[in-house]
């Protein structure tokens, strides 16, 4: 994970982004007019909480242990993703599919973290030494171990690339809405959030979409290093 001392910019930046995502998601959940929208918005609340917990290692590892291990969050968010895909199919729009892609990216991220953790645990079980690692475990390891991890994570990186593109597209769309203040068309608003009609609410809603999507993309960049090595340097 990240630390305030070694990756201070990323640590603080992600906390701010995810905290705002959580605040706005709770606001949407409280104001949700229907059961379907309420379920979808609370799913976003769960995701925002999970992303906050994923920032510091001291929070995420105990959380994973408490809920039964690294497979459990993958299953939880796979179910959430299935719900979001259903919502997108029911009320199809670019925005609704963007939200579905964001949850799919969360499943990919958690599955990749689970894989890296198993790779990093192997030297410990065999009695070999290992250096400390950060969020994804793909940095600050020996050259030999780094080569092994990159080879094992190549397919994960390839699978994650289109999801990262979707996250960035959603982040840009949210930022444009935050800047322009233009409301979404009622017929195109995804069922996963409350329709914002007031100018300030429109901007804040767009900012929340940007925060969640961009934060998810930023947090995941290091998982793409097997195919894009420069991504390892995006966590100052």
PLM segments and residue spans:
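Alpha-helical membrane segments of multi-pass proteins
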Residues: 1-236
């Amino acid at each position: 994970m990240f630390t305030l001392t070694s990756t201070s910019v990323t640590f603080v930046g992600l906390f701010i982004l995810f905290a705002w995502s959580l605040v706005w998601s709770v606001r949407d959940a409280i104001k949700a007019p229907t059961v379907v929208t309420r379920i979808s918005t609370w799913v976003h609340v769960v995701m925002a909480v999970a992303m906050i917990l994923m920032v510091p290692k001291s929070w995420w590892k105990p959380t994973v242990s408490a809920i039964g291990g690294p497979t459990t969050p993958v299953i939880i968010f796979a179910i959430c993703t299935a719900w979001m895909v259903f919502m997108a199919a029911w009320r199809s729009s670019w925005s609704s599919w963007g939200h579905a892609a964001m949850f799919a990216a969360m499943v990919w991220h958690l599955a990749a973290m689970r894989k890296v953790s198993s790779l990093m645990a192997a030297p410990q079980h065999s009695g070999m030494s290992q250096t400390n690692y950060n969020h994804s475990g793909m940095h600050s390891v020996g050259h030999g171990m780094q080569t092994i991890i990159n080879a094992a994570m190549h397919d994960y990186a390839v699978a994650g690339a289109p999801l990262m593109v979707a996250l960035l597209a959603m982040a840009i769309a949210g930022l444009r809405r935050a800047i322009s203040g233009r409301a979404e068309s009622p017929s195109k608003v995804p069922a996963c959030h409350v329709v914002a009609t007031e100018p300030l609410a429109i901007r804040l809603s767009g900012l929340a979409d940007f925060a969640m999507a961009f934060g998810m993309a930023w947090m995941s960049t290091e998982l793409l290093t097997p195919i894009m090595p420069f991504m390892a340097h995006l966590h100052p």
